[in-house]
């Protein structure tokens, strides 16, 4: 019997709220010797972790459910909240079920967090995942292949057996299937945003940070089948793209507030690891070379990734607006997020030249006052409707 929408969303919400990662503990306990590797936003090659027989687990901070006490002692106050809440998770034992942590190349703060983790958790595997700033296969490609090879060898030692090319190819195929399902979810949401609200889509995506990819793919398919059976009212809301939330995630209440203000979010950059690679990775040939080519030539465009050409800045954002039929863009970035806030003026300039309406605000993962954001988003939605009617 197919699961009901209520059961699917209940499962997703339970995974989202569980800061003790009980689902990970249960996965490990099911087969003795299993290992879990945590990773932070924005992107890591999860295929390598999966091919090693381990569970990749997205660590997206403590959200608005946890008070940060110990974590504040390791960082100054004028930075984003996610590194401090992640430290709080570690220092309070909530991440003890992780056998290692991967810290992607996002910003200086996360790079420094990887060093803190090495000092504080000496019994855990820790690696900073550097990525190329040069997109030539012979330069940046070789560098990235080397980085992935080091990770592959390290995880092989941790697993007690080498990570083979065949295992990598099989994992690439698994994640290709997952990316297809995620894209189907986003396409459906863009076509019927009243039917699949972003507050639900977000929970379904976040479940994929905890579940094995095979289970997450099935969950998405089940959600799409279940939500299609619902009868939900269509409203005259403004269609918007929400961008800037690629690392520290907004509280769920903020997403709901934007929707309640009269906006349909038809594209976003939440949980970007799910959509970082823009198409399928060939599951034949040299797996690390294929993963490298996908990153260099067919990956997303965000503030944490270097743009080689000035004219490329904002190209994918404009494409997203047009492809998903959006009427405007909401820039929602965490306070003190240097990559997002430094890039914002450049993207706003691109949108202005394209006559695409936009507005902007900042948040923290524990933002509690939603009224100002709801009022701003509502005013933006109203102005879009007035402009389009003029």
Per-region residue spans from a language model:
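A charged, amphipathic alpha-helical module
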Residues: 2-35, 145, 149, 153-280
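Glycine-rich, highly charged phosphate/nucleotide-binding loops
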Residues: 74-92, 305-318
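Metallocofactor- and cofactor-centric catalytic cores in central/energy metabolism, strongly enriched
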Residues: 16-29, 33-34, 38-42, 46-47, ...
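Acidic/His-rich segments in extracytoplasmic proteins that coordinate ligands and/or metal ions
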Residues: 85-157
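Short, acidic/turn-prone active-site loops that include or flank metal/cofactor-
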Residues: 60-66, 131-134, 269-273, 364-365
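TerminUS-proximal long segments
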Residues: 314-328, 332-390
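Redox- and metal-dependent alpha/beta enzyme cores, enriched for Fe-S-associated oxidoreductases
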Residues: 31, 42-43, 48-60, 245-309, ...
């Amino acid at each position: 019997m197919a699961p009901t929408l209520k059961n699917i969303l209940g499962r997703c919400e339970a995974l989202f709220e569980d800061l003790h990662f009980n689902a990970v503990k249960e996965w490990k306990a099911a087969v003795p010797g299993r290992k879990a590797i945590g990773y932070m936003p924005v992107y890591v090659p999860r295929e390598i972790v999966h091919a090693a027989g381990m569970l990749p687990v997205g660590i997206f901070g403590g959200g608005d459910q946890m008070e940060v006490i110990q974590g504040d002692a390791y960082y100054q106050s004028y930075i984003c909240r996610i590194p401090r809440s992640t430290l709080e998770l570690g220092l309070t034992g909530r991440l003890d079920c992780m056998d290692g942590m991967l810290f992607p190349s996002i910003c200086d703060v996360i790079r420094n967090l990887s060093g803190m983790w090495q000092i504080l958790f000496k019994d855990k595997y820790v690696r900073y995942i550097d990525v190329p700033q040069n997109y030539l296969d012979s330069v940046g490609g070789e560098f990235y292949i080397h980085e992935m090879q080091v990770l592959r060898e390290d995880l092989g030692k941790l697993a007690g057996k080498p990570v083979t090319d065949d295992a990598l190819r099989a994992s690439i195929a698994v994640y290709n299937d997952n990316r297809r399902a995620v894209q189907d979810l986003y396409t459906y949401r863009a076509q019927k945003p009243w039917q699949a609200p972003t507050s639900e889509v977000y929970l379904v995506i976040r479940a994929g940070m905890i579940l094995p990819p095979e289970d997450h793919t099935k969950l998405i398919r089940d959600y799409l089948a279940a939500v299609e059976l619902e009868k939900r009212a269509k409203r005259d809301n403004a269609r918007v793209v929400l961008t800037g939330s690629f690392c520290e995630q907004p509280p769920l209440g903020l997403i709901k507030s934007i929707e309640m203000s009269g906006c349909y979010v038809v594209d976003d950059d939440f949980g970007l690891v799910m959509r970082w690679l823009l198409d399928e990775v060939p599951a034949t040939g040299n797996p690390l070379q294929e993963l490298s080519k996908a990153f260099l030539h067919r990956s997303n465009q965000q503030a944490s990734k270097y743009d080689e050409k000035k004219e490329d800045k904002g190209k994918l954002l404009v494409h997203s607006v047009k492809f998903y039929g959006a009427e405007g863009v909401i820039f929602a970035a965490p306070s003190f997020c240097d990559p997002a806030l430094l890039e914002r003026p450049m993207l706003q300039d691109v949108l202005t030249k394209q006559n695409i309406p936009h507005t902007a605000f900042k948040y923290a993962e524990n933002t509690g006052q939603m009224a100002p954001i709801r009022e701003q988003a509502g005013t933006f939605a109203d102005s879009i409707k007035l402009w389009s009617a003029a």
